[in-house]
Amino acid sequence: MDQPILYSQTSFPNFTYSPGVVQDGGNYQYLGNYNAPSYPQPFFHVPVIKSEFGAHEEETPGSCHAASFDWNLYPHFQISNQAASNSSGDPSPEGRTEEDGSVSEGRSSSSPSPNSPLVPSFAQYWHYPSWQQGNLTNQAHTLFDGGDEKPQQSRHSPTASLGSGASNTEDEEVPSAISSRAERGLCSPSPNNASCGPGTEEDGMTLEEMEEFAKELKQKRVALGYTQGDIGHALGILYGKMFSQTTICRFESLQLTFKNMCKLKPLLEQWLGEAENNDNLQEMIHKAQIEEQNRKRKMRTCFDTVLKGQLEGHFMCNQKPGARELTEIAKELSLEKDVVRVWFCNRRQKEKSKFRMSKGHEFVGGASPGSIQSEHISFTPIPANSQDYGLASLHPNRAPFYPPPFPRNELFPHMAPGISMGVLTG
């Protein structure tokens, strides 16, 4: 008996993808062994980056240009109609064509071979900045040319003016700093280079004249019986500007700079004239030296018994008086205010020292060293068979400290002698 037809089954056409739908090329069901629709494999072309100077240059041994490849992730999964669908619309790699002996660049209309295993890579190269690349390019051309160009001769070279030919420029060039220094004729500020040459001049004074004056100054100073320190004091007395003995010594030995020697020379010339004409100059210098020593050293103040007792009375009333009180005490005792102030400072420091000494002699227990020597020190003996670890106190006024014995037999009865384990376990 025939079964009734419940549904009308119409035949459907085979399901096919449109050419615009992109499928996954890595899926196994779209390989060539399966009857699946084909689709065009896309190419992602990454062109070579042009240089900053426009056209591509010929590769040199030092260039870092990377090779340009097309972006093909699946070179071994190729579809039959790939080449046909990719013939138009995709950019092609740049190529070089030679026409009439010149190198030119153009674009090729042919796509790369689909069967070639291409590796994805970026057309990227490392390069210097534009301002530095031009310098390096010029240097490279100079090196590759073989160095036929000879270095130019220095214009400062004396041999160049004579026309004797090429010579080493390093030996002939004179640094600009040294030449300008020689033209100015200034001395070095270092003390070891006091003489710069016989032609050094400043304010109409040459170095030879300065050397002669320094030698004359030393001879006259020794003949008149003056020391280098006396000259410094004499300049302070006569002209109000005192110099040290070291400065006069350096002037005589030409260890000062030429500029400083020119400033000091007029004062020394005036001193020479004053020393030759004034016989009392030596006495004036001697008095000035004595007064200077007296100003540096102050006389020590001595207090008699009555004055000291009065100061002690004021100290017992107020150990730290103020400025007004110090002035009143100084007027009362006919002393200077600074003397009274210093005495109070010293007296307070003395009081602090006494307090520290008294605290240092006392022990922690409050006994003084005299009481310890007078008392009889006795120590309590420690029993030999005792289980405690007590020690007698070393201080005589304190009782000895005995800690309780360790309860060994109570906590650990099995450790007591004469008791077996059977008795404990019972």
UniProtKB/Swiss-Prot annotation:
PROSITE patterns: HOMEOBOX_1, HOMEOBOX_2, POU_2, POU_3. Residues 154-168 have a biased composition (Polar residues). Expressed in the animal half of oocytes and remains localized to the animal cap and marginal zone of blastula embryos. Expressed in the adult ovary and at a very low level in the adult kidney. Absent from primordial germ cells (PGCs). Residues 103-118 have a biased composition (Low complexity). One of its GO terms (molecular function) is transcription cis-regulatory region binding. The keyword NAD does not apply. Keywords: Developmental protein, Differentiation, DNA-binding, Homeobox, Nucleus, RNA-binding, Transcription, Transcription regulation. It is found in: Nucleus. Residues 202-276 form the POU-specific domain. This is POU domain, class 5, transcription factor 1.3.
